UniProtKB/Swiss-Prot annotation:
Keywords: Phosphoprotein, Transducer. Residues 168-179 have a biased composition (Acidic residues). Residues 1050-1276 form the Histidine kinase domain. It comes from Dictyostelium discoideum. This is Hybrid signal transduction protein dokA.
Length: 1671
């Protein structure tokens, strides 16, 4: 057999693996290591360690011991090399053995030949660089020798130079002797035959050439290939029928495979399911597979990679591993018996036979044969071995603090240069220890004899297997690849158990496990159990079979050790911490100069509240080297220098039986003498004590071997994770941060050296808040975490999570961590919305509840044998296996798989295929966009509708150009983040509206909702609904509504303008002297016009409400005047029909007189309801009642009820009346007419005010009438008479503050007035009583004449005499009452203003119904103050001004005008004009001339004198400026002003009004808002600008539009809606014009020139530009 040829290529060391073979793994940081092994390494190892024992069982025991000692020395040399390799993780390690006849490889292909040529060139360059580096090392060693020969004067404790040189010469001689013994040992082992000839190899013992690149910072890409290696390793026997179909699809899914995907993904153990499809014609096999989340997370690879790796089948020879050219990082493979698990990282899954277990068994078998000799021989051998160990220990103890070793292993020579400093004081201690160990060894040999006898049978089997493999070179019966195991299990339908090696190329970790392969009809399932990370938890080989069994039982699922999340379970970390203490020894005798150069600036300990370090042994070694430079020279370990870099132990450990596999037994025997060794030499690099925050008594403790790990080691393990790692010192100052995967964000690297650099990644507005939170968290000294916004250079904001972990020094005595033990901080920062960093993606806890339900559904299917799950365990037939009730253990899932086979019938397969086909059709033809994506933004699949929505093609999707995170605009980041948080918490999210960025750049509005896919923690399905068409339709509808509203507004203005003229002129005619026929005709014209205006207003109001332009204008207002306006508007129609219009307020509870709300909206609702009630009632009554329910504070609920005795509404038509334009069909609709908008408008308006409206109707045929009522909540406002100190809600409890006229009814010392009410209608009586009770009057009612006369007669004989009689003129006994009264004052009411009783001398007042508060109270007050009938005024309806005029004419005997004001309403106060004012005179006189401004001049209008008449000096005129463009409206306003005693000056537009503003002493301005050239708004603005300071002329708006708010904005003072009524005009003028005693205006107004107004100047400039453009 040819000698083995091993070559490992890498640019970065992975980790030293403590093993008996003693060579080191190397590998690239991003891909797998390459390893090519030819020859039986296992056999060479067995020969090197055991062949001599087998051949010389009875004669050569001493020689065997010598060989073992030499082997141990050789191991020490190897450890030196490994120690140097740990100093730099970027070194290239090439281990080659002696050139021996290699295996003859097949001819390489062109591609392989090109790779070999490139490899050869690269090796030549490497050799040149290595030679230069060796020269540099030698120069450094010479310089260090000179420095030691000439120590500084401060080191007075050093021995003389001559003594030091002698010690160095002795050390060099010992090293040379050891090297010669090693060479002899190697030559001796290779002389056994042609197949065992090797030099520098040792069959895996690690003797090889180590070439390091010191200080090389550049990382090499790619993997080098030795040209001497064979291009293929498949030289063994293959299955004749096995051919992998490379052209077949990779993802061919069988029905049974698809059915179990979701189940496997939920299992808590790693499982790999393989589907096998065999072609019976050609024997080809098609493989499909699925790896669950546990396995893919453990190996950091996909299911496709695992399936592809199975297509390369290694040779059946256990001593051959396929070369790198023939296998692409095979993820799953078995391992040769002679190959350690950690030496073949090119395979992810690998069944193996442990070398060290096999070696121990074979040694025991050999020792069992040697039992025929006496125990004295064994003791002699042990003594010889111990003597040899004593020599080694002397060498080890001579080394003080630094050791620099450069080893170059070539074909035949090994050069070693060693600089040491000896110390003879330790030799005696070592000798004593060795003597003790001799006794211990004798005892151990006696104890092992019995155990070896028990294991003889097993040792014979293993030896027989090894002999066959070594001697014959043929394949043994055991399968050599995981695929062959799978195929054997599939064909033979049996379960196969195999030990495998799992390799994770991404984080460069390896795990040993047991694979159980179980067959089923369509393939196999591989279950991996007892997983252990061999890089982190590699243990000492068991010394006995029982130890090996115990160690196997201790192998638990170590997947959690792989977790890179900051909150890893500290129990695992503590286990790793203790494990490293018990099985590794650390030597502090490294070179101080080299250690100081690689000193890590950061130190942390593994404790319960510190971050778990996942570094490999090389990282630990590097950290240990850093410790030695900071600690003093008191070494606690006297082991050999060669093993110092790969060993670590607890400082307080006295265990002599536990050691690393890289250390000889002498390392363990000297642990008791740690305190006796002292340092006599301190290097210059460590002469100055560095500042340390650790206790001095623990500085030199070996506990730092596992506590010290540098930031770079942790970063190395996280090379592929997008986590930002930061560190801070003990003061909380951030000293470094870096993104571990080194992938830039927006082309900028995330790296920095201080906290200010880190703040650059935080948005500007949040930096102060983030800094405060970060600093406060550090002050607490505890683990912290919080969320913050992370800003990229392109201003994209993402939600990040930062976590910090304090690092304490723990002395091993259960001390509690506190701030004084704090030595630094270590933390991580990662994207919170992408899998929660590495926390979720790697830990990946199984959803046990989901797993239980899925298994239950599958195993309860009919027609086949199933395993049924119960809540208490697993039930199969009558057997019940108790399981954990919580259902959360991995053992339960294993029992489920092992209990029964999973079978699926053909009918179920067909059903599944049909469902899958249906799903594909729905997915493709769905009108909704559907996509499958991950939290990282990757879109896995999408249908055509989604691609059409965002504008991308399927090619873009397959090329990975679509990322849903990049499709989201920045303004939708926050709502997307909230949706993702909801999705993670509830596994589904509510629909949200956002936008996607189309490929063209436009924004596409969408409505999306998402849900998590069952069994997955990263993937979700999202449904996207395109809102573009609906948004366009919505905008079109809004625009159409706006145009319609604008059209209706313009049309209504044009229609209402002539209607206002008709109403105004009709009113003027009614005020003149007309015949009854003429008056009736004009009144009909006026009523028709009012109806037309009302209809136009309804259409306009509904249009505004539909468009959304109706807004509430809440203000304080008096409730009674508004109610009276509503009643007065319907009085004429009600009186014409002869129905009673009744008003009742506060029957049960008082109603506040002043409330806070929208007066106009409330009035419109009441007008519609009362108007409809009057319209649809022919006889009877219409009642308006106001009641209240006290809520709390100043909030009350007002209820308005309108009840009538009309035709009623059928029950099935009630809902229809609230629909726009909805009416009751039939003759009633044609009879009464109407637009059908009133009630719908009322409903919307009441809802806008926060109320609701209801309707109650009786039978239409019975005529029971209809009741409408609505309730709104309003606030109570304080009336004007209430002091500010009294709350508005308490006004009812302070009657003394009520208006004075309430008390004027009762004179000083007089008793309350007694009032007799004669009325048959109880509702009318109730209405009158409510008014009289508010005035403290005593009311008595009578419905018949006899009763009334009896009451009058009885009152005269008593003191309670009746003072006032209120009676209706409808009563038949009115005349009898008038004849009987003497001193009583009679007030009559009725519907006819020209009633005959109006001329009766005993009637003091006649009231036209409806009876309101203002009318009745005014009449009672007059009845008290006036003593005769001639002193009374007849109070009539305000709408019938003609009657009022006639009454005034008849009251010519009034000597002086009487004006009585009322706080409740100014309208109820009758104002008398002067006697010389003739309101009936329709001709213009000199006192009331009209001045019309036309073209800048002052001319008379129609029938107006052309010149201004001289103003009489006896009565100065009161001028009012009127700006109006309509001639009819001008005439109406001018005539009304004439009647009120004012002179009008008219301007036809705003510009003309400004020109004449200073020509007359104007006391008020009436402005129309819509005029040509300059409207009223612009004119008002200019007027306010040219006014002097402190002066304000009243400006009253006149317009048909409800633009009240805009009028006030431009400076107007009041508002008059058209048509302008005389009474309202009179009230407005009296409010704003202040007069003296003679009625003359008291204020005069002056104005600046128009040029003072900036608005006027801009207006003129604009007009000039328009004229120029027109020309």
């Amino acid at each position: 057999m040819s000698s083995p040829h091993i070559e490992l290529h890498s640019q970065r060391t992975l980790s030293p693996q403590p093993s008996s073979n003693n060579f080191e793994l190397t590998g690239n940081k991003s891909c797998a290591l390459s390893a090519s092994l030819n020859g039986s390494i296992d056999d060479l190892n067995n020969n090197n360690n055991n062949n001599n024992n087998n051949n010389n069982n009875n004669n050569n025991n001493n020689n065997n011991n010598n060989n073992n000692n030499n082997n141990n020395n050789n191991n020490n040399n190897n450890n030196n090399n490994n120690n140097d390799g740990d100093k730099n993780d970027k070194k290239l390690l090439i281990i080659t053995n002696a050139p021996t006849p290699p295996l003859t490889p097949p001819q390489p292909t062109k591609t392989q030949q090109t790779l070999l040529e490139l490899n050869q060139k690269f090796q030549e360059q490497q050799q040149q660089q290595q030679q230069q580096q060796q020269l540099q090392k030698q120069n450094k060693q010479q310089q260090s020798q000179k420095q030691q020969e000439e120590p500084p004067s401060s080191q007075q404790e050093e021995p003389p130079l001559s003594q030091q040189q002698q010690e160095q010469e002795q050390e060099q001689e010992q090293e040379q002797e050891q090297e010669e013994q090693s060479k002899q040992k190697i030559e001796g082992k290779g002389g056994g035959g042609e197949e065992e000839e090797c030099e520098g190899g040792g069959g895996g013992e690690g003797e090889g050439e180590e070439q390091f690149k010191e200080g090389d910072e550049e990382e090499h890409e790619g993997i080098e290939i030795d040209p001497n290696l064979p291009t293929t390793g498949y030289t063994g026997k293959r299955r004749s029928s096995l051919q992998i179909n490379e052209a077949s699809p990779k993802l061919i899914q069988t029905p049974s495979v698809d059915r179990t995907l979701c189940i496997l993904d939920s299992l808590p153990c790693p499982i790999f399911q393989i589907g096998i499809i065999e072609n019976t014609e050609n024997g080809n096999i098609t493989l499909t597979g699925f790896a669950n989340e546990r396995l893919t997370t453990l190996l950091s690879c996909s299911s496709n990679l695992l399936v592809d790796s199975l297509k390369s089948i290694p040779s059946p020879h256990y001593n051959t591993v396929p070369s790198l050219e023939s296998c692409n990082s095979i993820p799953i493979n078995n391992l040769a018996p002679g190959l350690l698990p950690n030496t073949d990282p090119t395979k992810i899954l690998d069944p193996y036979i442990s070398l060290y277990n096999k070696k121990q068994l074979k040694e025991r078998y050999s020792n069992n044969n040697n039992n025929t000799n006496t125990n004295n021989n064994n003791n002699n051998n042990n003594n010889n071995n111990n003597n040899n160990n004593n020599n080694n220990n002397n060498n080890n103890n001579d080394t003080t603090t630094t050791t620099t070793t450069t080893t170059t292993t070539t074909t035949t020579t090994t050069t070693t240069t060693t600089t040491t400093t000896t110390n003879e004081s330790d030799n005696n201690n070592n000798n004593n220890n060795n003597n003790n160990n001799n006794n211990n060894n004798n005892n151990n040999n006696n104890n092992n004899n019995e155990e070896i006898k028990q294991n003889t049978k097993e040792g014979e089997e293993i030896l027989h297997e090894s002999t066959n493999s070594t001697g014959t070179g043929n394949s043994i019966s055991r399968p050599n690849s995981i695929l062959q195991c799978i195929l054997d299990s599939f064909h033979e339908q049996k379960t196969i158990t195999e030990k495998v090696l799992l390799s994770n190329f991404l984080i460069r970790q390896q795990y040993k496990s047991r694979a159980t392969i179980k067959p089923f009809p369509d393939g196999c399932i591989c279950i991996f159990e007892y997983i252990e990370n061999i890089n982190l938890n590699y243990q000492q080989p068991p010394t006995s079979l029982n130890d090996r069994i115990n160690s196997t039982n201790k192998l638990t699922n170590e997947m959690e050790l792989l977790s890179l999340s900051p909150d890893s379970n500290h129990q695992h970390v503590q286990k790793l911490h203790n494990h490293n203490h018990n099985h590794h020894n650390h030597n502090h005798n490294n070179t101080t100069q080299r250690a100081s150069s690689t000193d890590s600036p950061f130190i942390h300990s593994v404790s319960a509240n510190s971050l778990s370090s996942m570094s490999s042994n090389s990282s630990v070694t590097s950290a240990c080297a850093s410790l030695s430079s900071n600690s003093s020279s008191n070494s606690n370990n006297n082991s050999n220098n060669a093993s110092s870099s790969n060993c670590s132990s607890n400082a307080n450990s006295n265990n002599t039986n536990s050691s690393s596999s890289n250390c000889c037994c002498c390392c363990n025997n000297n642990n008791n003498n740690n305190t006796s060794s002292t340092s006599s030499t301190i290097s210059s690099a460590s002469s100055t004590k560095s500042k340390s925050y650790l206790h001095q008594q623990h500085k030199n403790s070996k506990v730092y071997s596992t506590l010290l790990n540098s930031f770079e080691n942790l970063s190395f393990l996280l090379k592929s994770t997008p986590i930002i790692i930061w560190r801070a010192d003990h003061n909380g100052e951030m000293v470094f941060f870096k993104k571990s995967d080194e992938i830039p964000i927006d082309e900028k690297k995330v790296v920095g050296n201080n906290f200010q650099d880190f703040l650059q990644w935080v948005p500007q507005t949040y930096r102060t808040n983030f800094q405060e939170m970060f600093q406060n968290s550090l002050k607490c000294g505890k683990i912290f975490e919080f969320l913050f916004w992370f800003q990229t250079p392109q201003n994209y904001v993402q939600l990040f999570k930062i976590a910090g972990y304090p690092i304490f020094h723990i002395d091993g005595k259960d001390c509690i961590a506190s701030k004084r033990y704090l030595i630094g901080w270590l933390g991580v920062t990662y994207n919170y919305l992408i899998n929660d960093g590495a926390e979720i993606s790697i830990k990946g806890s199984a959803n046990l509840d989901s797993m239980y339900e899925k298994f239950k559904i599958i195993y309860e299917m009919p027609n086949i044998e199933r395993t049924k799950l119960t809540n208490n365990g697993i039930s199969s037939g009558g057997d019940i296996t108790n399981a954990n009730n919580n259902g959360g253990s991995s053992e339960s899932s294993n029992k489920i798989l092992e209990k029964k086979k999973h079978l699926i019938s053909e009918a179920e397969k067909e059903c599944f295929l049909k469902c899958k086909e249906t799903y594909n059709i729905l997915f493709k033809l769905s009108l909704l966009g559907v996509m499958f994506s991950t939290f990282k933004g990757i879109i896995l699949d999408a249908n055509d509708m989604l691609l059409q929505t965002i504008g991308y093609t399927r090619g873009d999707l397959e090329n990975g150009k679509i990322d849903w995170m990049l499709l989201t605009p920045p303004e939708h980041f926050e709502i997307s983040a909230r949706a993702l948080q909801e999705l993670k918490a509830k596994r589904w999210c509510q629909p949200i509206e956002k936008a996607y960025i189309h490929k063209s750049g436009k924004r596409v509005p969408v409505l999306i909702t998402s849900a998590m896919i069952d069994g997955s923690t990263e993937q979700c399905i999202t449904f996207v609904f395109d809102l573009s068409r609906y948004r366009q339709a919505e905008m079109a509808a809004i625009e159409a509504t706006r145009l319609k509203t604008q059209f209706i507004t313009n049309i209504s203005h044009e229609l209402r303008t002539p209607c206002h003229g008709i109403v105004g002129m009709s009113q003027l005619l009614l005020d003149s002297q007309l015949t009854n026929t003429q008056r009736d005709n004009i009144d009909s014209i006026k009523r028709s016009t009012d109806s037309l205006i009302s209809l136009i207003n309804d259409i306009l109001d509904f249009s505004k409400l539909e468009y959304g332009k109706v807004t509430l204008e809440n203000e304080s207002f008096e409730l009674l005047p508004m109610i009276e306006e509503v009643l007065d508007s319907q009085a004429t129609a009600a009186n014409r029909k002869g129905i009673d219009l009744i008003f009742v307020m506060g029957r049960d509870y008082p109603v506040p007189p002043v409330i806070f709300g929208d007066r106009n909206s409330l009035k419109k609702v009441l007008l519609n309801l009362v108007g409809n009630a009057v319209k649809f009632t022919e006889t009877g009554f219409v009642l308006l009642e106001i009641s209240t329910d006290y809520e709390s504070g100043d909030q009350i609920s007002l209820r308005f009820t309108v009840k009538d005795s009309g035709i009623g509404i059928p029950e099935n038509k009630i809902e229809q009346i609230f629909v726009p334009f909805g009416q009751i069909d039939g003759s009633f609709s044609r009879k009464y007419g109407g637009s059908g908008l009133g009630l719908s408008f009322c409903k919307e308006l009441v809802a806008l005010m926060g109320g609701y409206i209801r309707v109650e109707s009786g039978d239409q045929e019975g005529g029971k009438g209809t009741t409408f009522w609505f309730a709104i909540k309003v606030s109570i406002s304080s009336p004007s008479y209430l002091p500010n100190s009294v709350p508005a809600a308490n006004q009812f409890f302070y009657p003394e503050y009520r208006p004075s006229h309430y008390n004027n009814v009762i004179g000083n010392g007089d008793s309350p007035k007694n009032v007799l009410i004669i009325e048959s209608n109880q509702m009318v009586i109730m209405s009158i009583q409510s008014i009289l009770l508010s005035m403290k009057c005593e009311c008595i009612s009578a419905s018949k004449a006899i009763t009334a006369l009896d009451l009058l007669e009885s009152s005269k004989s008593t003191e309670n005499q009746i003072d006032i009689i209120v009676c209706s003129d409808k009563s038949t006994f009115v005349q009898q009452i008038l004849d009987y009264v003497t001193t009583e004052k009679v007030i009559l009411y009725g519907v006819d203003p020209n009633s005959k009783y109006n001329e009766n001398s005993k009637v003091y007042s006649y009231l036209v119904t409806p009876i309101t508060h203002s009318k009745l109270i005014s009449s009672i007050l007059l009845s008290k103050n006036l003593k005769s009938k001639n002193s009374f005024l007849t109070t009539t309806n305000n709408t019938n001004n003609t009657n009022n005029t006639n009454n005034i004419e008849n009251k010519s005997s009034i000597d002086s005008p009487l004006s009585i004001t009322s706080t409740s309403s100014s309208i109820i106060t009758p104002i008398l004009t002067s006697n010389n004012l003739d309101l009936n005179n329709n001709n213009n006189n000199n006192n009331n001339s009209i001045l019309v401004s036309n073209n800048g001049g002052v001319d008379g209008g129609n029938n107006v004198p052309s010149t201004l008449t001289t103003i009489q000096q006896s009565q100065p005129k009161k001028y009012i400026l009127v700006a109006e463009d309509n001639d009819i409206n001008i005439k109406v306003v001018v005539r009304q002003l004439e009647k009120l005693g004012y002179t009008a000056i008219v301007g036809i537009n705003g510009l003309k009004a400004l020109e004449i503003i200073g020509s007359f002493p104007i006391c008020l301005i009436l402005l129309d808002c819509q005029m040509p050239q300059m409207d009223g708004f612009t004119c008002s603005t200019i007027l306010r600008q040219i006014e002097p300071t402190g002066q304000r002329i009243p400006i009253i708006a006149m317009t048909a539009n409800d633009s009240k708010d805009r009028c006030f904005e431009v400076g107007m003072d009041d508002y008059l809606s058209k048509p302008v009524r005389v009474d309202r005009l009179q009230k407005t003028l009296s409010d704003w014009i202040k007069t003296d005693e003679n009625g003359n205006p008291t204020n005069s107004y002056n104005f600046y020139p128009l040029s003072y107004s900036l608005v006027y100047n801009n207006f003129i400039d604009t007009q000039l530009k328009k004229e120029k453009n027109d020309d």
